[in-house]
Amino acid sequence: MADLNTIVDQLSGLTVMEAADLVKKLEEKWGVSAAAPVMVAGGAGGAAAAAPVEEKTEFNVVLADAGANKINVIKEVRAITGLGLKEAKDLVEGAPKEVKVGIPKAEADELKKKLEAAGAKVEIK
């Protein structure tokens, strides 16, 4: 068991480049590929399809189009993001752009309502 601890200590001291080189040498010596396990796991599609789908917890609010009332949309984007006037204007005029990223569903729905009330077309992804 002491030998394994020594090996672990030595491997922990490797740089990223040294670790990559070690992987290549082991692949050559043993005649395997690091990508092989991925292909084996991909072949079990039936079991993977039966697994429950994870519910998405983080959403992105995307401004699809500013609409006809750009000034109100710019004001709302500034209020939501805290951006300056120029940055908010650039974001609105550069649509489609992400307004907020990685937020909960409830907050994303609230921001969508606010932006749509200002005249924008909004998507939640």
UniProtKB/Swiss-Prot annotation:
Domain of life of the organism encoding this protein: Bacteria
Gene Ontology annotations of biological process type: translation
Pfam families in alphabetical order: Ribosomal_L12, Ribosomal_L12_N
This protein's UniProt keywords: Ribonucleoprotein, Ribosomal protein
Classification via SUPFAM superfamilies: ClpS-like (SSF54736), Ribosomal protein L7/12, oligomerisation (N-terminal) domain (SSF48300)
One GO MF term: structural constituent of ribosome
Gene Ontology CC, one term: cytosolic large ribosomal subunit
NCBIfam families recorded: L12 (TIGR00855)
Quaternary organization: Homodimer. Part of the ribosomal stalk of the 50S ribosomal subunit. Forms a multimeric L10(L12)X complex, where L10 forms an elongated spine to which 2 to 4 L12 dimers bind in a sequential fashion. Binds GTP-bound translation factors.
Purpose: Forms part of the ribosomal stalk which helps the ribosome interact with GTP-bound translation factors. Is thus essential for accurate translation.
Family membership: Belongs to the bacterial ribosomal protein bL12 family.
Protein name per Swiss-Prot or TrEMBL: Large ribosomal subunit protein bL12
Naturally occurring in which organism (per UniProt): Anaeromyxobacter sp. (strain Fw109-5)
Organism ancestry: Bacteria, Pseudomonadati, Myxococcota, Myxococcia, Myxococcales
